[in-house]
Every structure is written in C-alpha cells, then in structure tokens.
Regions:
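Substrate-recognition element of Asp-dependent hydrolases with the DxDx(T/V) motif
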Residues: 54, 264, 268-304, 314-327, ...
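A short, N-terminal amphipathic alpha-helix
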Residues: 33-50, 64, 263-275, 303-311
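N-terminal nucleotide-binding beta1-loop-alpha1 segment
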Residues: 1-21, 46, 202, 236-242
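Active-site neighborhood of HAD-like aspartate-dependent phosphohydrolases
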Residues: 235-279
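Short beta-strand-to-loop element that shapes/binds the nucleotide-sugar donor at the catalytic cleft/hinge
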Residues: 131-145
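Conserved N-terminal catalytic core of the sugar/cofactor nucleotidyltransferase
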Residues: 1-7, 15, 29, 33-109, ...
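Asp-based, Mg2+/Mn2+-dependent phosphohydrolase catalytic module
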Residues: 295-298, 302-316, 325-362, 366-405
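Catalytic-core segments of class I nucleotidyltransferases/pyrophosphorylases
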Residues: 105-106, 113, 119-125, 137-140, ...
C-alpha cells in the first residue's frame, strides 16, 4: 500500500503576476488556509504517512510555512522538504529527491486539485511504472491531451485549439521509484519522461469525472476561494464498529475473529463515492480486560482500512477507547471521556477534521452510541441489524433535515 505523497511546489506562477512574487502558488491563501493545506489534508485521508514537498522557487517560504501546514493536518504525518539546487524542472525535482523516495509514491501538482477517488493509485501494479488520474474537459486548450487504448496511456499531445475537448492529465499520479532512473538533473516529467513511459507500455490511466481546478490563472484562483472550501468541507458518516461494521462475536480484537457485517464495505464505498468522510468510533474494552493488546486493535484497524481501500472505499480515520473503569489491566483502569456514552472520540474527530456537527451522522447499535451522538451534537441513528448498505443508502440520499431519527 502506498504511504508516501510527493508534491511539486516549486513552480514560478508567472501567470498570477504580483500574487506569486513573494508567495509560491501552493502557499496562496484559499478560503481560510494555504491551498497546499487543502491538498495535504485530502491525501492524509488515504493513509498517507509521509509527505515530501519538492521545492525550488521561494523554497524559504515553504520551509517557513511547514509548522503552519502541520497545524491544518487532521493527524500527524512526516512532512519534509527536498530543495532542488537549480531550476531543475518537474523531472529534475524528482531526480534531486531520489534518496528520499519510497519504492512507490503518489505525486501531485501543488497548484491544482482533482477531487477524485485515489484508491486506484494506492496499490502498486506489476509491470506498470505509473498510473495517472485523467479528466475529460470540454475545453482542453490550457493543457496537453492524453491518448488512451483501454486503460493504457499511449501518447501525450500538445495543447489543442481553443474550444477543443480532450482528456487531460489531472496532475495526480502513482509512480514507481524506477521512473526516477529515467530522469536527470534538469528535465521535465511531462515532456521528457511520461511520453517515453507511454511508448514503452508502462503507463496506465484512470478517468474520473471528479471536480478539477488549477489555480494557475487569476480567474480560477478567484473561483477557488469559494469552491474549494465548499467542496472539501464534507459531511461525515461515523460508524460504531462491533455490531455495525463487523459481526459482534464478543471481544473482537484480531483478524481471525473479524467478520464483516453484510453490506458494510458496500456502505462505506457508497459514502465515499458521494463525497462523505467515513470514520470509525469504537469502545475496545477487550484491551482493558486483557483479552487482546492495543497493538492488536491498531493492526486490525489498519487491515480494515486497507481492505476497504482495495475495494474502492475509504475509512478516513479511526478513534477507539481501550479504557474501562473496572479494567483487569491496571494501565487501562480509569474513566475516560472517550468511552461511549461519553462523546470524547466524536468531539476529537470534529476538532481534528474541522467537521460541521450538523453534517455528521453516527450509526450505532446500542443506546450508548446514541447517547454519545447526542452529547456531541451529531445525529445518532440506531442500526437494527441486517444489511448496512440498505440502511445507509437513504441517509446518503436525504439531507440532514430528513434523516430518519
């Protein structure tokens, strides 16, 4: 599973004039934060733990802004910089960062945002060195266009005439580190590397109709001020785990005892496809009782997230409470504001992800879940059992005033 995201943040931004004379494009304010903070927040949803920024022009501004960027992230990740020694181009930036790259990594343009499902990029593919996310535009004249045969990228063409439709590179990639062997100290990924990969049959593409914006021109930077916060401030589905996501066999702490509730993965896929966050909030008193270890819970939740991601869904984040006031294990014997019916886990997610409580629904199977939802100020819905996808579908179809309490 891919854990590193590399972001190109060294462009000059000449089309934006004075706006980028002292500020790199990715650090321009969009809504209430730097544009780059929106990008990094999105990739963290997919389990990325290492973000590497490839800097050039005004690198000192990026470096000075690192702590501010970390404050916008919903959870801690490694956030580092690779600075090119000269103006090296997009391929050259990868070349100079080669010692810091994972075997497989995501690559993003730092001045565009493609709100698409990244799950096709999150696993490596044998015999393939890269996969691109592609967007079909009615007017592709600002960009080069991509030619395809099935899902194989066959060629890249120059910008078409104004008003011409085409399939464009959305600036979101998964690349194998072997691609860097084809780069040099000064080269362009788009002009020098990707066309050769396509010619050699090593490049694949996935088309998405997700929302796309490139802030490289003043009109789109202006449009981004309203549309980026509007589109990326998402509703959230919060799921209890035992009895909602998995069959409650009692004290499920390992994969061996884990069984998905019918429709659980489908429900998560549906919510993700509709643009919702999906979170897990679960009491795990089995740790306090000594039935399994906290490391077992973490491993199980990591496996759940990877399984869902492979199926095209996404669990954005997980909160669990291992404490119990009558714990057998002394280290876990205490009252906790995170243990439902207390709302601590939900409140922490609201804070970390900057969620609107009015746009959040918690689904649980016990009165303690409903009490926690009420205390946190979110809607709570009691799951009676059966197929979770059938239960979730009308919630996604309705707006918050119609949720079936």
């Amino acid at each position: 599973m891919i854990r590193q995201c590399v972001i190109l943040v060294g462009g000059l931004g000449t089309r934006l004039g004075a706006a980028t004379s002292t500020t790199p494009k990715p650090m321009l304010t969009v809504g209430d934060r730097p544009f780059l903070a929106w990008l990094t927040r999105e990739v963290v949803r997919y389990g990325i733990t290492d973000i590497l920024l490839l800097t050039g022009h005004l690198a000192e501004v990026i470096r000075a802004g690192l702590e501010g960027l970390r404050e916008w992230l919903p959870r801690a990740v490694t956030l580092t910089i690779s600075e090119e020694p000269i103006r090296a181009g997009t391929g050259g930036a990868l070349y100079h960062a080669r010692e810091k790259l994972h075997d497989g990594f995501l690559l993003l343009n730092g001045d565009s945002l493609f709100d698409c499902d990244l799950s096709p990029l999150m696993t490596e593919e044998p015999g393939v060195l890269g996969r691109l996310m592609l967007r079909r535009l009615a007017d592709a004249s600002r960009y080069g266009v991509v030619e395809m045969s099935g899902d194989r990228v066959t060629a890249f063409q120059e910008r078409p005439e104004p008003g011409s439709p085409g399939l464009i590179n959305g600036g979101v990639y998964r690349l194998d580190r072997q691609v860097v062997d084809r780069t040099s100290a000064m080269c362009s990924l788009e002009r020098d590397i990707l066309p050769d990969l396509a010619w050699d049959g090593l490049l694949r593409g996935t088309e998405s109709d997700g929302w796309f914006i490139d802030i490289g021109v003043p009109s789109d930077l202006y449009r981004a001020q309203r549309e980026v916060p509007q589109r990326l401030t998402r509703p959230a589905l919060l799921l209890d785990r035992d009895g909602v996501c998995n069959v409650d066999h009692g004290w499920v702490g390992t994969r061996e005892r884990f069984e998905w509730v019918p429709g659980a993965q489908a429900a998560i896929r549906m919510a993700h496809a509709r643009g919702w966050h999906v979170f897990i909030v679960t009491n795990q008193a089995g740790v306090a009782r000594g039935l399994y270890h906290e490391a077992d819970v973490l491993a199980l939740h990591g496996w759940m997230r990877d399984e869902v991601l492979r199926s095209g869904g996404l669990i954005d984040d997980v909160r669990y409470c291992p404490f119990h006031p009558e714990a057998v294990v002394p280290a876990y014997r205490r009252n906790s504001s995170w243990r439902k019916p207390a709302p601590g886990m939900i409140l922490d997610l609201l804070r970390a992800w900057r969620l609107d409580p009015n746009q959040c629904v918690l689904i649980g199977d016990r009165p303690t879940d409903m009490a926690a939802a009420t205390a946190a100020g979110v809607t709570g819905l009691l799951f009676p059992g059966g197929n979770l996808a059938d239960f979730v579908r009308p919630i996604l179809d309705a707006n918050q005033t119609e949720w079936p309490v």
